[in-house]
Design a protein with these regions (language model features):
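Intrinsic-disorder/low-complexity signal
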Residues: 43-167
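Extracellular calcium-associated, cysteine-rich motifs in secreted modular proteins
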Residues: 1-51
Length: 167
């Protein structure tokens, strides 16, 4: 398989990715973090993993957070569209996919190689549920051998966080 790399990564204003990895012990399921620093996010937790993976996790059990990914031709993965022609697949959509209290959305690339171009990842709070605002979330991503992530604070249903990845 050809190597996969992110040539450029864009973040919303005031958001930074944590590129350093400090092992904290065994993998903790449902947090979108590479806890054991082996280059994989939430492996062994019932989620699919791939060379291109975008995952968001949140702790408020009644909240709904949406992870949407658009590919270079504009096809979108979201709660209504679970696959694109370019090979993106919505692997897990919580809480509707029976997530056993671990709220995650997970999008992976099932194709051998990504379509070249810009991928846009949008994370938004759909419903805070019975919890109070803000809702805390963590966005983790993997492109090839590069794994990173950031903590997010979602303050309202009008707010969204957009990230761009040039592959």
């Amino acid at each position: 398989m050809p190597p996969v790399e992110a040539k450029h990564v864009g973040t919303p204003s005031g958001v930074w990715f944590d590129e350093a990895c400090t092992p904290t012990g065994p993998e903790v399921c449902g947090n979108a973090i590479d806890d054991n620093c082996n280059g994989l996010i939430d492996e062994g937790c019932g989620l699919s993993i791939a060379r291109v993976q975008f995952e968001v996790a949140w702790s408020e059990p009644t909240a709904t957070v949406e992870l949407a990914v658009s590919d270079p031709v504009g096809d979108v993965i979201d709660s209504s569209h679970r696959a694109t022609r370019s090979g993106l697949k919505l692997d897990k959509k919580c809480p509707q996919d029976g997530c056993s209290g671990q709220n995650v959305d997970n999008v992976i690339l099932v194709a051998d190689a990504p379509m070249p171009g810009q991928y846009t990842v949008t994370i938004r709070l759909v419903d805070p549920g019975k919890g109070s605002l803000p809702v805390k979330a963590h966005f983790g991503w993997r492109v090839g051998d590069r794994v990173s992530g950031t903590n997010l604070t979602l303050r309202s249903t009008d707010e969204k966080k957009d990230f761009s990845f040039e592959l």
